[in-house]
């Protein structure tokens, strides 16, 4: 009986991962800007800050355009650890051009790690959710938005909520279930 229960849990977990991965791919396809500059970064970062205040959570928020940090805000209640998590998650997204949450789920499904698969040090790279590539239609990845301070799925959702608003995509069409 224990084996059957474990097998059912594994199947359910795999289905959840596959469902999330499909939705994450949709997010990366749909959440694209026509243009993105420092003013857009300010609007995005400010919206994430407002959403986090509405939710009563403290976040570190970082937005990069190319290799330049164009927005950073560490809310009261966060600390250096949150900024370091943001750096590590952002490094993974800058290298692999997919969200840190998608990377996490893909590696979990494979039973692997970024260190084992890519040889990347855990000190500098993390695959916990909360970092999302910023895409411009017809151009590709131009930057990264990263959120750190709450559980990884919630970090990711916070970034996606703000991206959907600024890209004019209804949140219900791209949000994780």
Where on the chain are the PLM-derived regions?
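Secondary-structure boundary elements
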Residues: 54-55, 137-138, 165-170
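Intrinsically disordered, low-complexity terminal regulatory regions
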Residues: 2-79
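Short, solvent-exposed cationic patches
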Residues: 94-97, 156-177
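Extended hydrophobic
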Residues: 115-164
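Structured interaction and signal-relay segments at domain junctions
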Residues: 55-118
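Short, positively charged
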Residues: 39-42, 108-116, 168-172
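N-proximal short alpha-helices
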Residues: 13-25, 112, 128, 132, ...
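Generic macromolecular interface patches on structured domains
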Residues: 58, 149, 169-173
């Amino acid at each position: 009986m224990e084996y059957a229960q474990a097998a059912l849990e594994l199947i359910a977990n795999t289905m959840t991962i596959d469902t999330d991965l499909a939705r994450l791919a949709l997010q990366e396809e749909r959440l694209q800007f026509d243009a993105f500059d420092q003013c857009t970064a300010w609007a995005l970062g400010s919206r994430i800050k407002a959403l986090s205040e509405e939710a009563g959570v403290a976040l570190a928020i970082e937005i990069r355009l190319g290799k330049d940090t164009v927005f950073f805000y560490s809310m009261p209640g966060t600390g250096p650890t949150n900024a370091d998590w943001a750096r590590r998650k952002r490094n993974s997204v800058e290298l692999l051009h997919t969200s840190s949450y998608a990377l996490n789920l893909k590696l979990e499904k494979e039973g692997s790690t970024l260190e084992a698969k890519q040889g990347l040090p855990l000190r500098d790279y993390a695959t916990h959710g909360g970092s999302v590539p910023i895409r411009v239609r017809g151009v590709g990845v131009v930057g990264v938005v990263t959120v750190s301070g709450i559980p990884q799925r919630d970090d990711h959702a916070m970034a996606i909520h703000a991206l959907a608003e600024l890209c004019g995509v209804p949140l219900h069409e791209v949000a994780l279930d």
